[in-house]
């Protein structure tokens, strides 16, 4: 007998997020989900998660960036490798342009800073609003507001934003993550 009450198969998409930081601030925008979020989005075909995170940062903010604060990748000979994310989140989302029904995003989360040194670059003006959010604002746990849009930060955005700022501080000081170690027996 065939079951008719079986749940629909779960649809999952791979996404990448880049917490863009500069001098004690992280960039967040008002997302259509009604939340303040960092730049991010779906991986394009043949794109690795680092490429996706950096592309999303550039597309959404206009700022070229580089990844910081990742764990030491395991080096295995001359094989290509991708920097590991600082975290991987799984988020249930409503329908979007990639799937009309609710689904999950498996999100590769990276920390990044502007590729070029200098003063904090301007963020896009308009809709959706973008903000450079300070470490003090993240620690205050007060809702963020821009115009008519106000909402508390999701706990993971607050925690990851603070961690990204700390990694950016270490990166500027030259005391970031250690260099990759070669695998035993690798040339």
Q: Where do the PLM segments sit?
A:
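Short secondary-structure boundary/capping segments
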Residues: 10, 18, 98-102, 121-123
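Histidine-centered active-site/metal-ligand motif
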Residues: 13, 31, 42, 103-105
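Residues embedded in well-ordered beta-strands
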Residues: 17-19, 25-26, 109-111
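Conserved Nudix-box catalytic region and its N-terminal flanking loop in Nudix hydrolases
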Residues: 22-79
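Nudix hydrolase/Nudix homology domain
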Residues: 34-36, 102-187
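Active-site segment of metal-dependent pyrophosphate-handling enzymes
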Residues: 62-117
């Amino acid at each position: 007998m065939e079951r008719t009450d079986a749940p629909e198969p779960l649809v999952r998409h791979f996404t990448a997020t880049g917490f863009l930081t500069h001098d004690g601030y992280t960039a967040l925008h008002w997302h259509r989900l009604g939340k303040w979020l960092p730049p991010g989005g779906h991986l394009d075909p043949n794109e690795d998660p680092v490429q996706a995170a950096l592309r999303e940062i550039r597309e959404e903010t206009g700022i070229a960036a580089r990844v910081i604060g990742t764990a030491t990748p395991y080096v295995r000979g001359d094989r290509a490798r991708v920097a590991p994310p600082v975290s991987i989140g799984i988020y249930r989302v409503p329908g979007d342009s990639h799937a009309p029904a609710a689904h999950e995003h498996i999100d590769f989360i990276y920390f990044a800073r502007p590729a070029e040194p200098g003063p904090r670059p301007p963020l896009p003006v308009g809709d959706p609003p973008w903000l450079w959010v300070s470490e003090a604002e993240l620690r205050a746990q007060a809702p963020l507001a821009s115009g008519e849009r106000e909402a508390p930060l999701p706990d993971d955005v607050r925690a990851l934003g603070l961690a990204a700022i700390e990694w950016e501080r270490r990166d500027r000081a030259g005391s970031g993550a250690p260099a990759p170690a070669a695998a035993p027996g690798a040339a």
